[in-house]
Amino acid sequence: MTFHTLNELIADGVRGRYILVRSDLNVPLDGSEVTDDGRIKASLPVLTKLTDAGARVLVTAHLGRPKGAPEEKYSLKPAATRLAELAPFQVTLAGDTVGASAKEHAAALQDGEVLVLENVRFDARETSKDDAERGAFADELVSLTGENGAFVDDAFGAVHRKHASVYDVATRLPSYQGDLVHTEVEVLRKLTTETQRPYVVVLGGSKVSDKLAVIDNLIGKADTILVGGGMLFTFLAADGHKVAGSLLEEDQIPVVQDYLKRAADAGTEFVVPTDVVVAAKFAADADHETVRADAIEGSSFGAQGIGLDIGPESAAEFANRIKGAKTVFWNGPMGVFEFDAFAGGTRAIALALTEADAFTVVGGGDSAAAVRTLGFADDQFGHISTGGGASLEYLEGKELPGLSVLDR
């Protein structure tokens, strides 16, 4: 694929022009407080370049999964407030997306200023499966840019969505790839076509079903796949072990067994924990103990025990594998890192990545939130992706609509 770049757009001149920018402001909130502003900070460079060049910038973004109508808890107000605190330019939030407030504020926008339009998912047409409905919403967004507008997609976390603000606007305006999207694609390309070996992939998170396609595509490409998180218990069950009350997707056991066989034939090694931390219940203060992974029901909690983290022996083994790698991709926490008693595995993986002499990539979503929650800085890793689902779909080999539509 070949894309028009942000630098090309700026070289053509943007002063006084309305530039529609799809940003990723989908940040976690605690009430009205942003708890992780990583995506907001990642959006700043493109917005700053454009405002420095005199553009009038209209930002579209989503937050959460509202049901096609305004919901206060999904308002972009907290994200826009944090953006304004961080930005060297003026930021205003419209009271709607394409209504009277958006039109009034857009008309009043001055060179070098930013207007954040309210959550695009407050309009059901944004995510519609009907091309005409999405197109009509895209037309209304585009109309805010006037006669000489342009579109910049800088929301890598949304490029796997065929949504109006990602896909359809790009068919209606001269369109450019934002610097963040460019960086993300270049990083992921190194994980698929220019990979230095050994290549170690760390997969966690709760469900193996969420990772099936990426696992399928990594067999024969990755040298080693380290399995943690809730998904590890389906791997243990596939090997004939009982997992007590731990998360288990029984319908995926045959799939995992097939993967294990194929991986052995293809030269990819799956490494499953040899010990796990088992708790009496899912709670921060739950009684817990470490047991062998093949004897989970032998814990003090019997068949009611719940595995909530990989054990220290497994964490050390995973860390050694990571430190021996030249390329590492990590997606998904090893345990319930939000509870300190069950954060040990995730912390060990993060620390190993910071110490590895390797190109290290932390997948977006929970993994990015985990490293920041546990006190690690972004610059301790080679790259922290802003796109969880988008990163996985890229590694699955899928075509991403938000990228393909930018291909010139």
Curated annotation (Swiss-Prot):
Cellular compartments annotated: Cytoplasm
GO cellular component: cytosol
Enzyme Commission number(s) from the entry: 2.7.2.3
Enzyme's top EC category: transferase
UniProt: substrate binding residues: 24-26, 39, 62-65, 121, 161
The entry's keywords: ATP-binding, Cytoplasm, Glycolysis, Kinase, Nucleotide-binding, Transferase
Reactions performed catalytically: (2R)-3-phosphoglycerate + ATP = (2R)-3-phospho-glyceroyl phosphate + ADP
Signal peptide start-end: none
Disulfide links within the chain: none
Record-level Gene Ontology MF annotations: ADP binding; ATP binding; phosphoglycerate kinase activity
Family, per entry: Belongs to the phosphoglycerate kinase family.
Protein name: Phosphoglycerate kinase
Organism: Arthrobacter sp. (strain FB24)
